[in-house]
């Protein structure tokens, strides 16, 4: 706005007169007010004010002038002084006012205009001034802001300078540090180099050390083998000497026995009849004893020793280590000590060999205590003589146990760990040395009993009485009573022992121990005639109270029972070892289902009669010390633990090792509970060592009143001891309370049931005893019997309506107790009776908890699966093991199947007071089997938490954690599919569409990422496993996820993945977890589909055929690049399959690019003509007429089986147009109808051919240069490893994804089939019959059946008879019958072979069969011999071959390389054995191949010419010899001889297969010209190409070959280079090349090209001849 105003502002700086001109000029002149400064604005303002004043003055002047003009105008109008004025007046007055205009400008109007303009300008100036003032204010404010910003800028600039200074400092420091670090890096690099150098040195040293170590290991293994051999010889010799010694000892003993007999007879005659009765008994028993001593060191002795020396000792640590620590020493057995020391172990060293050196006894370990034993009275020695069986007269001396293996008081563990001196005499009781010399078959217990009862009659006890026993609670004896009892016992034992002269093997006692024995207040255990006056003696009628909670304490001896014969039954099991597992310390006899069962407990008592003299029982009392559990405890069928009241623990648990023995005569055994070791029990042991209380003898003999406690007590004792006779006598008395309970509440029925006396239980139940009478802890007889496992007692009690669900005070039911102790027969009976499984104890435990807590799988299975019969309580006797067996079997076969559990889920998940379920217990204790059974129950809740919020997984061991993690895991097979394979499609009959590679475990917590990784990893592992070299498991192989396998397959080869029927891709996620997804969709398998030809890929072809992907892609590139490709190789090399798959891949690629494509197949046979081929080309639009424009369609033509026709005849006319495909180079072809026309091949035509022939020959070689050839060699990839990979994949599929171990029979069978294929081809190549070579196709059908190697051998025999043998036969005949005309180069097999040819064929088949096929067969020799007859030609005698022609080898030949006939040793004039070529070679040029095998650095051109001349002359002489009727099989026979003469069978596969071996079979040593220099292996050898060794070939090479010759190879080239340019080398070069390990590769690698080269050269040189 200011500028607008200024632009119109006039300049009034002029004089007022010029004001009018100024207005005109003002428009032109403009001012820009905005550009003026303050001073200029002020000046302008003052000028304007001056102008305004000037205007005012002008206005006033103008007003004055106007006045004058007005007056003049008004009044001077008519003045005649001025004529002009008069004219003006007249003018104005003449016309109207409106029409007239003034003659001059009116000054007033001008003034008014000027004034109006001034007003406008004034207004404008005022607005401009106001704007200028506002701008001025704004400018002032901006200046203030600018100043502030300048100050801030200064501050920031200063701060920037400071920061720059700091940064400069930091940069300098960093530069300095960089320099330091770079110097450090250089130093570190130097150090690293030094360290690496040191590391290399160390590695070299380490490798050297490893080699030395391996050598040392080898040496040490050889030494060990030698030592083992010597040791075995020494062992044999020792056994022989020992047997001899035994015989001598037996003979000596017999002689001594005869001497003793004679002496005693003489003494008897002298003494007369008076002394005869007193001597007869000792003599009789002594004679028996000596007879038993005679063969004391033979085999069964070790069994008896093991019975006695191996009890598990748990109560005292120092006794634990005793049994095997000290060998028996002969010094312990001097006759004096043995006769006097009752505590001695081996008391008759003169007659007894001192024990067994491998078995140490308890008594051997107490030598320190022996000298302290005072000698006994002399009458003992007189009576017994040198008694081998005399033991210390301890309170528990050896009882008569005629049928058991050792004295039953093997309770040496019962010694409390108070002091060793107390325990040691106790050990002396049970030394095996006392029995070591006894009769080997006669039970050592019987021997011990015999000697005991003969020898201890007069031993004084501590009171001076000649009694065997210590003072017992009811003993106030007189000598007469003691003598009566002992005499009765002695008579009984004598009668019993007279029945046991035959050898007996007995089950050992199971030693028991009470760990709570209170020993400190008692005198030493071993009372060897020492007076112990501190022992309290109790009157006969006042028995001490039975210790609480210890039922069944024996307080009376049992009455006599005559069934001692039963002891001999079933020659008891010799399983006398001691199991050390807290449950059974001695193994039960094999004839019993239960270790604690009483043998014949039902039958024995029925025939007992009290009229017989009483027999000694096994009531063996213990010293008042109470430290050792008596024999009663040994025979006790079960004992309660001392710590816990009632039945909370099994009899065999850790706290109670009073283990029941196998008792042979039930009624004469008095069980005693473990409480006999408790305090206060010292005088409660009743019976003397003979088993009879003297005060009880009159009662039993006369029927008078027993001087014991009351009848109820006696009733309980009889029931506890199983004394059926006494029990029946007592039950017949009137007024007897059969339900009387002792202070523990134990009734007679309870004691009998607890100890397993079935007959006593039956008697008491028939007498109407209370069946459910409970003790003070609430346990009934059924509880006791179930806890102890006495299932017959349980059966009886259930039959008498015992309460099967009775719960004790702690809530334990009989079923709970049976489960707690693992008594499965009792569990089964209780369940069949309808016992409730869900009753809980006070702690909240059910029977399931109890079964799981002990880890008893059978108990748990019964609880979960055993159904109660429909008819209720079943008491029928069944096989006790049958249901368990069926259960196991069904459980294994179908864990979730038809065998469903009968317990509800609530019971399985029942928690105790701590919140622990059965699964918690099983998992925490590591009972994996129990946890597995629980997991099979569908209702198990593994996630249930205890009161500490822990699941079963939280408390589980590692094994159980793994089980729980996989509890609900889905095992889904992962399969690889290659799509549909058309049946019979070009050799793909043996290919499989799908292969199972593994099973994926999908858990509940598995995420999709984990699942995707698992699938990818499984695929990668599988591809690498099938392409690896050896049988390595997936765990052993270090797989790399990033790299593809050696066959080129990897995760990128996958086209799609389907989960069941739902498509899925790696990395894809669904809303559900994989576990839920699989369950919901019921996905039974995961299928991975590989990319195939339909997608333009070859991955599925690679996986199907096991040809590496890189090679297939290379073949495809060759076809696309060269358009004309022929695949050739031995028959069965999958040529047709490869060509067809490549064609399919190309077709789909072209179609994807928008082209139409067609595949045309033509199978060529002998009648296929060139005209037919022309028609084929024309009809398929490959050949296009010249006038016609080319088509855009792509055509792929496959010509199969070209070997059946002549290549030159069939394809000869097409070679030029195929190479030059354009209309400019047409060719005239004649159609099948006879018309001819010009055609050309267009660019979009691809031609593939297949030839099932190892090499070309003759005129067919002309075709070679016009095609690109792909050679499929049997000894080179892809064929070499194809069979191995294919069979490995087959095995992996058969084992459902697992790779079996290398020692698995399946692996050995597959390796054998693979070796057969390789060895066959190796031998056939060596025999010079390449047309018989086989590709791997025939071996792809090898059956893989685990456990049936015979099937593979049968398959091999069929393959041999149908394919291999006919081909070999034809090839051998064709080679042995070459046409007589030279130069034709064709072989024709004779239709009627001569006898010599037939013999050669048979020999060749037999040698091939033995060397290549049967060698290495995994079947045993016997089975293999049965299958040998199935192979054709296997019966030919090889001796005929070896004797066909004498062919000696030279000394220079190494053993590893059987180089027979590998070098030319004959001149042409003395060519005695002809050289045979392959059938596809002419006779010419063959010698040259063997002579000029290597490129020697000598005149190549000269040598070339000479070699051909040599060659032709040799061949001519050969043909002349044929025409003379030579033996044309000699050559083959010599080669066969060389194959036979190889020492090692496997040498066939190692024999070098070089070209000379294919064709040279002359005998060595016949060529003096060449044999002069045989030993110069260092001839310079030039190589054009070195063929690499494949891994298989390298392993096949012999170790004895020369290492320096590994690189020797021949020229390998696809170009037609004449082989004759190679110089003929001297003999030494020939030798070195023949021993090179590359010979094996070279035969097949180069045979075809070289043959072609030969042919071309021959054809060039033939006209020159």
UniProtKB/Swiss-Prot annotation:
Residues 120-276 form a coiled coil. The modification Phosphoserine is found at residue 1526. Keywords: ANK repeat, Cell projection, Coiled coil, Cytoplasm, Methylation, Phosphoprotein, Repeat, Synapse. The modification Asymmetric dimethylarginine is found at residue 499. It is found in: Cytoplasm, Cell cortex; Cell projection, Dendritic spine. One of its GO terms (biological process) is regulation of synapse organization. Residues 385-395, 584-594, 1564-1576, 1584-1604 have a biased composition (Polar residues). This is Cortactin-binding protein 2. It comes from Equus caballus (Horse). The lineage of its organism: Eukaryota, Metazoa, Chordata, Craniata, Vertebrata.
